[in-house]
Amino acid sequence: EVGAATGTFNITVIALNDAPTIAINTGVTLTESGSVSITALMLNEGDPDDEAAGLTYTVTSAPVKGQLELTTGSGVAIANFTQDDIDNSRVIYVHDGSESLEDSFVFSLADGGEDEVGAATGTFNITVIALNDVPTLSGAGDTLSFTENGGATAIDGDLSVTDVDDTDLESATITISSGYVSSEDVLGFTDTSSITGSWNASTGVITLSGTDTKANYETALESVTYNNTSENPNTSALTITWVINDGDGNSSSVTSTVSVSAVNDVPILGNAGDVLAFTENDRATVIDQNLSVMDVDDANLELATITISSGYVSSEDLLGFSTQNGISGSWNSGAGVMTLSGSSSKADYETALESVTYDNTAEDPNTIARTITWVINDGTVNSSTVTSTINVIAVNDAPTIAPSAGGTVKESETFVITSLKLQAIDPDDVPAGLIYTVTSAPVKGQLELTTAVGVIITNFTQEDVDNSRVIYVHDGS
């Protein structure tokens, strides 16, 4: 009945390094152009004998549509990281914004003591959720130099349309975003088979709409024109703002510039053409009371000329004007021109022109028609000429006889009646047309002509007198 002997047998276990394994590899999903943290729920090791900081991932094939970074080194691509980096959300994937919907990287995982055991390897898959990329409009910035009356002109011929995820565009807006004057500024577009234009004059916006290729929209945008319909345009610079749309979003805006240069418009003188019937010995008479003065880009006129351009007779024709409203007149009788000068309103010049008079100082006026030519000037340029007409009507003037003391003759002799003794005056008749009629004949002699001696006459002309053909013959009593 002796008890059994007992003892303890000790076994010593020599530890071996366990190679790491990949316990979790789910991949990750993010949106286009975004970034995402790679966490331990997505990528994790299975190594019972190593700390996370001792487990190193080595990227053997890097992602091609983005890059791996550490939050502690933003923007710097990495090729190595630890499980500790993952556990603390320090590893991120940053997408490059391209249109690819997937990416990946290949890695190996080692703890540094595999005892000739190969490192674990794997591929981490990245899924990209696509987002719409807004179209891009570039190449703007041209300055169109538009001159008044220049007609519709293309604004910018250097535009460029791109969209990385669309082949077509759906619409575009072109806006006069600065300097717009609705009464004069106009944008224009000629419709194509797919793109139509609509101009809103109240807002200064032209809208292009219709599905068409980016290339066709680029051509359409480069054909949009600017025009200014005013004869006195506002010369403030205009800003043209361009925006395109792919059906899902607008591009950023770009701008061009339109500079407008005004051109002096000639003044216009209208409604001339009156015909003045001027009768000899009339007083100075207004020539034309229906004139009209216009100038779209000037409030004042500076000068006017009124010319007797046809039929002028310097010895008798006279134009007259009375100074008024800062306008004075100067008559040049050598040229037959009345010049009005002085800066004054168009209305004042119209009144002044309608007060210009014609007079004829002759008692035997030339009756050829006179043409009156009118011109106004705004300080820079003359208007076109307009004309009125003056018809001069002569009136027969009655002759007069200059006082005469008569003559002296000796008894039974002959006395020659000369123009020194008898002179008829008539401004509109020649001497041969002035006929003397004897209404009471001499009683102590008789009147005769030297061309018919002995024949009593009762009529003779001033021409007979001027040529000493009229004689008085005394009868000797």
Q: Where are each of the predicted segments found?
A:
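Extracellular glycosylation-rich, acidic/polar low-complexity regions of adhesion-
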Residues: 1-477
